[in-house]
A protein has these predicted regions:
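Glycosyltransferase donor-sugar binding loop
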Residues: 10-25, 39-43
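Short glycine/serine-rich donor-binding loops of glycosyltransferases
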Residues: 70-73
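Acidic donor-binding loop of glycosyltransferase active sites
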Residues: 52-68, 81
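Conserved acidic donor-binding segment of nucleotide-sugar-dependent glycosyltransferases
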Residues: 99-107, 115-121
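A charged, aromatic-enriched C-terminal amphipathic alpha-helix characteristic of glycosyltransferases
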Residues: 125-153
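Short hydrophobic signal-anchor/transmembrane segments that target glycosyltransferases
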Residues: 1-9
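Short hydrophobic beta-strand element within catalytic cores of glycosyltransferases
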Residues: 78, 82-85
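Short acidic/histidine- and often glycine-rich active-site loop of Leloir-type glycosyltransferases
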Residues: 88-101
């Protein structure tokens, strides 16, 4: 759906794709090599560089729909102001109201990509602050350790 959108922005995909059969299957089907906006940049192992890519991205697009707390989503919330998430329970639980959600209905993501380009910077900054607050309040090591201490102390008293 990105390729059918009118956005002038690039879609930067950070992944090890070169030897992937799936990459070649999808490329044969969608011909994304013909869209100059689609950029596969490979895997980035340099943490500082990856943080810089996330921080300077216009938005983070998260299409995972299988359960649990996804580390890449947590990292994005901590560094990217505009986070576009597939609308499933796991993602909603993590992002709450700090993210914008899209569905799997035809053209839903396409329209969202075009719509978010109309957001003013103050709104994007507000979402970014909410995302960073969400990470700090629910997923920081301080919070996690405190929750485990409480759990273990309650178990000890039983």
């Amino acid at each position: 759906e990105f390729m059918s959108s009118n956005t002038k922005k690039d879609l930067v995909i950070v992944t090890g794709y070169q030897e992937s059969k799936l990459y070649h299957i999808l490329n044969n089907k969608y011909h994304f090599e013909n869209d100059q906006r689609v950029k596969f940049v490979g895997t980035i192992y340099d943490d500082a560089l990856l943080k810089s890519v996330r921080k300077n991205a216009f938005a983070y697009l998260h299409g995972h729909e299988v359960g649990g707390t996804n580390p890449s989503l947590l990292e994005a919330l901590g560094s990217t102001s505009l986070n576009l998430l597939l609308n499933v329970g796991f993602n909603q639980e993590v992002g709450l109201d700090s993210c914008i959600y899209w569905g799997k209905e035809k053209n839903n993501l396409k329209h969202l990509i075009e719509h978010v380009e109309t957001f003013d910077q103050d709104y994007i900054d507000t979402l970014g602050k909410a995302a960073k607050d969400r990470i700090k309040n629910a997923y920081s090591w301080t919070k996690i350790v405190s929750d485990y201490e409480s759990l273990f102390l309650r178990k000890k008293d039983l």
